[in-house]
UniProtKB/Swiss-Prot annotation:
Species name: Pseudomonas fluorescens (strain ATCC BAA-477 / NRRL B-23932 / Pf-5)
Catalysed transformations (reactions): allantoate + H2O = (S)-ureidoglycolate + urea
Pathway: Nitrogen metabolism; (S)-allantoin degradation; (S)-ureidoglycolate from allantoate (aminidohydrolase route): step 1/1
Cited Pfam families: Allantoicase
Domain of life: Bacteria
Name used for this protein in its record: Probable allantoicase
GO BP: allantoin catabolic process; purine nucleobase metabolic process
Entry keyword set: Hydrolase, Purine metabolism
Family: Belongs to the allantoicase family.
Coiled coil: none
Keyword flag Hydrolase: yes
Amino acid sequence: MKTNAVAFEKFVNLADARLGTKIISVTDDWFADANRLFQPTPAVWKEGIFDDNGKWMDGWESRRKRFEGYDSAVIRLGVAGSIKGVDIDTSFFTGNFPPSASLEACFLAAGEPDENTQWTEVLPAVELQGNSHHYHEIHNHQPFSHLRFNIYPDGGVARLRVYGIPYRDWSAIGDDEQVDLAAALNGGRALACSDEHFGRMGNLLNPGRGINMGDGWETARRRTPGNDWVIIALGHAGEIEKIIVDTLHFKGNYPDSCSIQGAFVKGGTDSQIETQSLFWRELLPSQKLEMHAEHSFVEQIRALGPITHVRLNVFPDGGVSRLRLLGKVKK
């Protein structure tokens, strides 16, 4: 299953708590709060820790069902989008995991689902194992705003990851409106990087400033010549007018300097784009960076016209919390 997961895990986790994902309703979360499903960190085991309802578990856990039926949770995604794949993670749930689970979805421009909502099955019931990741591709290209996560008949799940492409009505953006074209909420996604040993590349595009050093992109210490880099696909083609490189929380491990290249890419696979990025034009010439600071660049930006992709180069290595690419949409 992991071979299928590699491709879609590069997409944005639409169910990330940092994007605003939350439980709207749940049939039962007696043992463990269902909102834990969306935490960005891996599930943990706390030996010997109990609360008033029993063993503390890092995930959603319902009571043992003593009547007909099954448990479900209605979820509002932090950002609506088309789903590419899901990971149902039962880490540390061994004698208390559900034997199976399914997913339904709907799209609402406003409000929450009710008894009249029409749900679409996006993942038929699949078997689950204890203490395991379950990766499944989704073959429905509609945008969805809400999910109904069903577990049969009861039990616990540690995490639910929902990878996809955020939906944004770009026609509603004004011609003179400046937006962050790289933001995860606007469909930006990190495609590839040289290294992400200490922090995932996708963190660069999360909303808000970083929570801590782990909530950014950080590479291992480079012991060979060269520099580290990350390639980002913008949510929409546009002209960049302002760049923000934020090294918040990175003090003894921030890059000495950075530069950015850009291009209007018309096609090709992610791996082909990685190779082509070596020859992209310079959008932002090399700039010195400081620790634990937000760096804004406007006058230093070179006019490349509309672009779809950028390559952030850091010299020689280190950590960056956030990257913002503000500009106007090319319609």
